A protein has these predicted regions:
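Active-site-proximal alpha-helix that buttresses catalytic centers in soluble enzyme cores
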Residues: 1-131, 183
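Short helix-loop-beta junction
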Residues: 25-34, 159-171
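Two-component system phosphotransfer/interaction surface
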Residues: 106-117, 205-217
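Short, charged low-complexity linear segments at domain edges
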Residues: 117-128, 153-169
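Polybasic, low-complexity association/targeting segments
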Residues: 122-146
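Immediate flanking context of iron-sulfur cluster ligation sites
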Residues: 134-142, 162-183
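Local cysteine-cluster metal-coordination motifs and their immediate loop/turn environment
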Residues: 139-154, 177-198
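Short Fe-S-cluster ligation motifs
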Residues: 172-188, 208-240
Length: 242
């Protein structure tokens, strides 16, 4: 690791799948005397862990991105986040090094620890003209990643939805996929809801997920066999439902 073997190492879960695999990530971190942080939807965040280590006096910090699935952001996103943190860090700043590629399984962590590049602060920022406008999507599919849905395999559901949309040539301007916390009807996990159609699906395994994509999100016909009943309590001032 380029010299100082005592530099704190942080294993960074890059996607929601690594948040689900928290226990495994902690085991791997223990083997490398490392800590764990998450790029998204998990605590601590990368920025929070960098701040904690820097405040404790670390002069050098090593970040290794870990992806146990197929849908994690590229390693460049970890550099982007670390670069933003470095620019915003007041006072003394540690040297931050990031592995140039992700570890795709526990065995690869040791290998990528030898592939480090310093963060300079000149990395791309967190804003871009490409991210200015709300996408022009006709549907938003919300995939529940709450505790029960996660335990029932919603990571595979999400992966199936995304890969099928890609296979059918759909982009964020067609269907926007959003990972959510608990959507409530947990007995029917994994749950997926589709807006603005207000259609809810339960027991969405990968096969059902692919049907939802092809028949509903692309074909615009809800999959009735997987649909959950949906009632809405009338409130004062509500417009009548058409």
């Amino acid at each position: 690791m380029n010299g100082d073997v005592l530099a704190p190492v942080v294993l960074v879960g890059m996607s929601v799948r690594e948040v689900q695999a928290r226990d495994l990530l902690q085991e791997v971190a223990h083997e490398h005397r490392a800590t764990v942080a998450y790029l998204q939807m998990g605590d601590p965040s990368v920025s929070a862990e960098l701040t904690r280590l820097a405040d404790r006096g670390a002069e050098r910090i090593v970040l290794v991105g870990v992806s146990l699935g197929s849908l994690a952001p590229a390693a460049s996103w970890l550099r982007r986040i670390a670069g933003h943190w470095l620019r915003q860090r007041p006072g003394r700043r540690p040297v931050v090094e990031v592995a140039t590629r992700l570890a795709n399984d526990p065995v690869q962590v040791r290998e990528v620890l030898g592939l480090l590049r310093p963060v300079t602060g000149a990395e791309a920022g967190l804003e871009s003209a490409a991210w200015e406008d709300v996408p022009g999507h006709r549907h938003q599919a919300l995939v529940c990643r709450g505790p029960r849905c996660t335990a029932m395999g919603s990571d595979r559901t999400a992966e199936a939805v995304i890969l099928e949309l890609m296979r059918l040539g759909q982009s964020d301007d067609d269907v926007l996929i959003t990972h959510t916390g608990c959507q409530f009807p947990c007995n029917h996990a994994p749950v997926v809801s589709v807006q603005p159609d207000d259609v809810w699906y339960g027991d969405v395994d990968p096969d059902v997920a692919r049907r939802i994509v092809a028949e509903h999100l692309v074909g615009r016909r809800p999959v009735e066999s997987a649909r959950l009943p949906r009632t809405r309590r009338a409130q004062a001032g509500d417009e009548p439902l058409v």
